[in-house]
Amino acid sequence: NVDDPGIIHDADTPEDYAELLRAHNQSLIRSEIHIQLAREKVFFDEQLYSLLTLIQETGSVRDACEHMHISYSTSWNLIRTLESQLHKPLVSRSQGGVNGSHSELTPYGEEFLKRYARFSEETRNCSEKIFENCFRGFFNA
């Protein structure tokens, strides 16, 4: 008696294959870690990491907001809260002019993002190892 649907069922059509893939993916269990930084309250999370990364890539807070579907005022509130918690500016702003306004991360902001990315990656790697040690073979039993 075989319990593997990949052996029992044909995958001759795209629909059959899609169903097998759906069943396989549904059977995968993994841990999910969300990294946040806090003092009394959370002041930095993955959403703000994405916002700052987009500001650096686009050179524009407004463009970053459009990509993330958040309001311009919300983004500035998040940035101001972060900067007040770290006591340093992370985003430098230049006003209008011929080429319009421009924003970019300060050197401190760039270093902060690098360190957060490293911390996040190392935390996820440790979490995966711990998850594997705690649950290896458990869900397949």
Locate the predicted segments by residue.
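Basic, amphipathic "hinge/linker" alpha-helix immediately C-terminal to the N-terminal HTH DNA-binding motif
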Residues: R93-R118
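Short, Lys/Arg-enriched N-terminal segment that forms or immediately precedes the first helix
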Residues: S27-E40
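Short helix-boundary/capping micro-motifs
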Residues: T58-A64
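Residues within the DNA-recognition helix of helix-turn-helix
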Residues: L78
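Conserved alpha/beta core of the MobA/IspD/sugar-nucleotide pyrophosphorylase nucleotidyltransferase superfamily
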Residues: N1-R30
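Helix-turn-helix/homeodomain-like alpha-helical modules used for DNA recognition
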Residues: E110-A141
